[in-house]
């Protein structure tokens, strides 16, 4: 069915939601298709979208809890069935939706005996709980429970050092990722020079955002990454012009050469693309056809490996070696 729709308008590139389900309040699923794409583009977009969905989409969760007269995470509270640790873990699992940025304050004030759920949290107007039935604690006696919460909207995650507790304040390891998982697959159709691709993207969220909203935010974040390149010439950014002899790299080479950490060095080499090395077109195109796109990719090849690349002769190898030695003082191994 999708293939028939695509053949009607081969020139119109568009996203289409082909499946949407809510398995529960905290598990939503969406499947989307982007088409038609030229051969090779679906994989490029799929990789970028998956990374943006899993790492760049913002979420809201509890980052700090304050309990009066409690000194330790594993303390037992008279009249409450759960330990402090269990209460913190239950609070960590609560899924929020927020329209505002920054830190917000919330609280729980309950008199037992009774069960305490997410519905008992007193929230600011801009914050909403996705599943109000989520369990927090069970008060077994006629006691008063007063809990102060700090809620934050952010992206990625925050890991606190252990035993970092003072005056009953307990930081919580926060995972701000509303996207639980994201996968993509590619379907090709056509033949010869008319091969086209359909990118299928599957998204699972915790209900803090719908899959469609997560897709929109991830797409917007990717677009924002490239906006500086569009205005780079107007802003006259140092090192971004293409004049002969100029430094095309966005950072000094000394940062790469003096970095003694292997991991940091690899990250730096991943940021340098082979088109920045000003290699001859024939040499550059041969490297691209061999899926060598960054300096890190290139350094994974020995001299003998380079000689085995199609249409890559001794002259091309010497050109690469000269550039590596001149710019980075690097001499690849012979085998």
From Swiss-Prot:
Quote the catalytic activity from the record.
RNA(n) + a ribonucleoside 5'-triphosphate = RNA(n+1) + diphosphate
**One function term, GO molecular function aspect:** DNA-directed RNA polymerase activity
The record's Gene Ontology cellular component field reads: chloroplast; DNA-directed RNA polymerase complex; mitochondrion
Q: Report keywords, A-Z.
A: Chloroplast, DNA-directed RNA polymerase, Nucleotidyltransferase, Plastid, Transcription, Transferase
Q: Name one GO biological process term.
A: DNA-templated transcription
Where are the stretches annotated Alpha N-terminal domain (alpha-NTD)?
A: 1-233
Region annotation (Alpha C-terminal domain (alpha-CTD)) maps to: 264-335
**Recorded E.C. number(s)?**
2.7.7.6
The subunit field of the Swiss-Prot or TrEMBL record says: In plastids the minimal PEP RNA polymerase catalytic core is composed of four subunits: alpha, beta, beta', and beta''. When a (nuclear-encoded) sigma factor is associated with the core the holoenzyme is formed, which can initiate transcription.
Family, as annotated: Belongs to the RNA polymerase alpha chain family.
Supply the name of the protein.
DNA-directed RNA polymerase subunit alpha
Name the source organism.
Answer: Pinus thunbergii
């Amino acid at each position: 069915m999708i293939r028939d729709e695509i053949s009607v308008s081969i020139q119109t590139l568009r996203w289409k939601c082909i499946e949407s389900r809510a398995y529960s309040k905290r598990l939503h699923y969406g499947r989307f298709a982007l088409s038609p794409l030229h051969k090779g583009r679906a994989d490029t977009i799929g990789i970028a979208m998956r990374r943006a969905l899993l790492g760049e989409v913002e979420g809201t969760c509890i980052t700090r809890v304050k309990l009066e007269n409690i000194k330790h995470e594993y303390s037992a509270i008279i009249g409450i069935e759960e330990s402090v640790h269990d209460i913190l873990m239950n609070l960590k699992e609560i899924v929020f939706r927020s329209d505002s940025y920054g830190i917000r304050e919330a609280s729980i004030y309950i008199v037992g005996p009774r069960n305490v759920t997410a519905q008992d949290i007193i929230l600011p107007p801009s914050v909403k709980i996705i599943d109000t039935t989520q369990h927090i604690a069970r008060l077994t006696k006629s006691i008063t429970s007063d809990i102060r919460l700090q809620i934050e909207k952010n992206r990625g995650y925050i890991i606190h050092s252990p035993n970092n507790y003072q005056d009953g304040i307990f930081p919580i390891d926060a995972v701000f990722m509303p996207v639980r998982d994201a996968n993509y697959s590619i379907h090709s159709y056509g033949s010869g020079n008319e091969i086209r691709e359909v990118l299928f993207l599957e998204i699972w969220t915790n209900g803090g955002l719908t899959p469609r909203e997560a897709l929109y935010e991830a797409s917007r974040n990717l677009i924002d990454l490239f906006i500086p390149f569009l205005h780079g010439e107007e802003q006259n950014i140092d090192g971004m012009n293409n004049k002969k002899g100029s430094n095309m790299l966005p950072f000094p080479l000394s940062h790469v050469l003096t970095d003694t950490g292997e991991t940091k060095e690899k990250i730096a080499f991943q940021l340098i693309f082979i088109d920045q090395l000003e290699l001859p077109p024939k040499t550059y195109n041969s490297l691209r056809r061999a899926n060598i796109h960054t300096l890190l990719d290139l350094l994974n090849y020995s001299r003998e490996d380079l000689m085995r690349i199609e249409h890559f002769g001794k002259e091309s190898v010497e050109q690469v070696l000269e550039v590596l030695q001149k710019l980075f003082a690097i001499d690849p191994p012979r085998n």
